[in-house]
A protein has these predicted regions:
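N-terminal beta1-alpha1 cap of cysteine-dependent amidohydrolase-like domains
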Residues: 1-123, 133-141, 145-157
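Conserved G/P- and acidic residue-centered "switch" motifs that form tight phosphate/ATP-binding loops
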Residues: 126
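The feature captures the ABC ATPase H-loop/switch
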Residues: 129
């Protein structure tokens, strides 16, 4: 079923026979010698527990964002072990060991911007909030845990 990306013409989820569809962008990881698209189970489970249908989306082109959003009732930008590339907010990479996911950066920043423009609900966690901030022109501290009185909040996968 094709849904309208325009919130004014998109039928509400309760008017359809299906659950709300939430896009969950995947991370890009190497498992051994092979590239994979992955999403944390805790995020997929949380979407289901909220009564929605999660759809893990592999990397997409910026030209596919509107089409994806036309099918979605919401977007969940998840946390990740990777960071938004500092070059995307006008800084050089301070630490070459910084885990980056340039493929995710390429399409989740336009996805966040467009979802907000269209009024598609967007929920962001950790890296996802950083993506949203950068997509809207904000900047980040590359190593916030190194600032006084700041701790790393990373949890086990």
């Amino acid at each position: 079923m094709k849904r309208s990306a325009n919130p004014e013409t998109r039928a509400p989820a309760d008017a359809r026979a299906d659950r709300p569809l939430v896009l969950v962008p995947a991370d890009n990881r190497m498992l051994g010698e092979h590239p994979f698209h992955v999403a944390g189970k805790k995020y997929v489970d949380a979407v289901r527990l909220a009564g929605c249908l999660p759809l893990v989306v592999p990397s997409a082109g910026a030209d596919e964002v509107d089409e994806l959003l036309s099918h979605a009732d919401g977007v969940l930008l998840t946390g990740s072990a990777s960071n938004v590339n500092p070059r995307l907010f006008g800084q050089e990479v301070n630490d070459p060991s910084l885990p980056l996911d340039p493929v995710r950066d390429t399409w989740t920043l336009p996805l966040a911007r467009r979802a907000l423009e269209l009024g598609v609900p967007l929920f962001a966690i950790c890296r996802g909030f950083q993506e949203t901030n950068v997509a809207l022109g904000g900047t980040l501290f590359q190593a916030i845990h190194e600032l006084p009185d700041k701790d790393s909040h990373r949890s086990a996968p």
